[in-house]
Amino acid sequence: MKSTSHGTLLFDGDAELLLCHATGGRHWDIPKGMADPGESSAQAALREAREECGLDLDPHALCDLGQFTYRPDKDLRLHAVLIERVDPAQCVCSTFFTDRWGRLRPEMDDFRWTPFAEVHDRCAKNMALVLTRRLSLAAVLEGLLAGR
């Protein structure tokens, strides 16, 4: 059975997306993760944005973009929100893992506003395909700006 990861696309008004760097990896990602028992997709996406970026988002501003095939064993349910541009240095990840040397490390260790044109190069292949081929980031932003 496929699992589903719930994520949020964090847009500013300047056609950039806030991406998070996965600690120990070479790629950038969006805040996302599995839903806790009894949690809706929107609740999981909001929680992941809070845990991985330190951002408390308005649940009423969240736009459900739908579910996308992400990997053979996992789907990706995406939400989008337009936020005031935050200083990436103020973002803080509050979820941790133990690395192979026994050190406690944050899941995300850096944050960056990324122009849409650079998303494909920064993200892992499957995420890049969802964000640049299955979605139009420009169209999503246009809808958010129009209040749809």
Residue ranges and their predicted role:
Residues M1-I30, H79:
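N-terminal strand-loop-strand
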Residues D29, S41, L55, L76, ...:
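Membrane-topology and secretion signals of cell-surface/extracellular proteins
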Residues R26-H27, P31, P37, L78-V81, ...:
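Functional cleft and adjacent loop/helix regions within the main domain
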Residues F68-R100, R112-A117, V130-E142:
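Active-site-adjacent beta-strand/loop module that shapes the phosphate/pyrophosphate-binding cleft
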Residues D14-L17, G24-R26, D36, P72-D73, ...:
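Short, charged/polar surface micro-motifs in flexible loops or helix N-caps
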Residues A35, V119-H120:
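A generic structural signal for short hydrophobic patches within well-formed alpha-helices
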Residues I30-D64:
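The catalytic Nudix box helix
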Residues M1-S3, D12, R71-D73, P106-M108:
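A generic fold-level signal
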